[in-house]
């Protein structure tokens, strides 16, 4: 089940960080829409980060958890999973057009996009380009979304492309308020992300 778990989580890697802010979103909740727009603009400027944390995956026939390392440098990413989730280790690296997945004791898999890996290995169609936005507490800009703001004008929850995303807590790092605990609910798949260390960076335009 290691490969299944790894590929499920590989959808976080598709780069969309440089896209615009023209998301088609319906905003509700306690927060102020003007403050939300400012918050969104600030977070969208982040084009680099390093994350250390934990990830849990629950599907109808299997589940697991493990540690997560995610390095983002504009259009390059290096994502590593290890621990009980995979009974070993895996590394996902790439940039737009070329993705490589290395699984301990199982081999190397390549595809143009993480979506292709999911489709080829599992037959699943998921909005894999969205998590690079969701992990920053933003809706993806290329499809409709329903956004609920908390009292601090940050995302409390998000509905987009059949997924429900809950933001349970935030942490302040280098002047940015970033998600600390996130739950994602999709059809027959739940993902929990706990970020223990955020190192956001603005590398340049």
UniProtKB/Swiss-Prot annotation:
InterPro entries: LolA/LolB/LppX, OM_lipoprot_LolB. It is found in: Cell outer membrane. Transmembrane segments: none annotated. Pfam families: LolB. GO terms for cellular component: cell outer membrane. A lipid is attached at residue 18 (N-palmitoyl cysteine). Plays a critical role in the incorporation of lipoproteins in the outer membrane after they are released by the LolA protein. Belongs to the LolB family. This is Outer-membrane lipoprotein LolB. It comes from Pseudomonas syringae pv. tomato (strain ATCC BAA-871 / DC3000). The lineage of its organism: Bacteria, Pseudomonadati, Pseudomonadota, Gammaproteobacteria, Pseudomonadales.
């Amino acid at each position: 089940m290691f490969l299944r778990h790894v590929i499920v989580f590989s959808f976080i890697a598709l780069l969309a960080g440089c896209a615009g802010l023209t998301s088609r979103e319906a905003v509700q909740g306690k927060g102020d829409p003007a403050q939300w727009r400012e918050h969104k603009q600030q977070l969208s400027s982040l084009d680099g980060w390093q994350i250390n944390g934990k990830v849990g995956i629950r599907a109808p026939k299997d589940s697991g958890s493990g540690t997560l390392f995610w390095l983002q440098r504009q259009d390059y990413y290096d994502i590593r999973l290890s621990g009980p989730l995979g009974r070993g280790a895996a590394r996902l690296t790439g940039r737009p057009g070329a993705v490589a997945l290395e699984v301990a004791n199982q081999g190397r898999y390549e595809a143009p996009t993480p979506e292709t890996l999911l489709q080829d290995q599992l037959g699943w169609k998921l909005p894999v380009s969205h998590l690079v936005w969701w992990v920053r507490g933003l809706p993806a800009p290329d499809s409709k979304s329903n956004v609920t703001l908390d009292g601090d004008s940050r995302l409390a929850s998000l509905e987009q492309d059949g997924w429900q995303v809950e933001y349970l807590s935030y942490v302040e790092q280098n002047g940015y308020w970033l998600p600390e605990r996130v739950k994602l609910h999709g059809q027959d798949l739940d993902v929990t992300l706990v970020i223990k260390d955020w190192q956001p960076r603005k590398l340049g335009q």
